[in-house]
Amino acid sequence: LDMEEEDFLSAELEIVPAGKARDCGLDRSMVIGYGQDDRVCAFTSLFAMLETENPERTSCCILVDKEEIGSVGATGMHSRFFEDYVAELMALTEDGNPLKVRRALRNSYMLSSDVSAAFDPLYADAFEKKNTAYFGRGLVFNKFTGSRGKNNSNDANAEYIAKVRQVLDNNEVGFQTAEMGRVDLGGGGTIAYIMANYGMNVIDSGVAVLSMHAPYEVTSKADIYEAYRGYKAFLKDIK
């Protein structure tokens, strides 16, 4: 490589574990690999979007960066790039009224696709066993996330949750509901609250992950498949 020391001044390095993702478990029912938070949700969301034909509502899949440090910067969800794109689309209509941009955002439905913490028997005290995610039970929904209760979280309303449930039930998609660990012990943040600030209906959904943020994370193949099916059903049938 024709590289000099000064090139590192403007380099952007992405250093990750060298091992490839592989089967895990005696029955090979799981996947082990680095960065499944949140590649596993990006993968399922993108494929669901690409394979959805002629949805009744205008649909999109947004892949954003910097969630772990507050969704800041030009590529984080706090950036106004999505709002700008909606405005650009509205400007192409006969009436480019800025008020319609806000109405379009407010009338939108969103699944905030992010992983959830799978129950870990080695750290059972960190979970509420009757309200946590388990492997093999399907797509996970979190009514709220945050930490210390609902701090810095979105709180999905009951009517929207019922609407999403109906879509999944009609398409026979396996799903479960969960918290992100016990109150005052667990917790985690997503981008859901940012989009909810527009008034749109948002709920967190994703795949349960074991050993989240470890060099190698573990997910269930069945859950990955149900996430893909659930996202596709949402794009096709949400009204």
Feature locations, PLM:
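Short acidic, glycine/serine/threonine-rich loops at helix termini
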Residues: L26-D27, S71-G76, P121-A124, Y216-V218
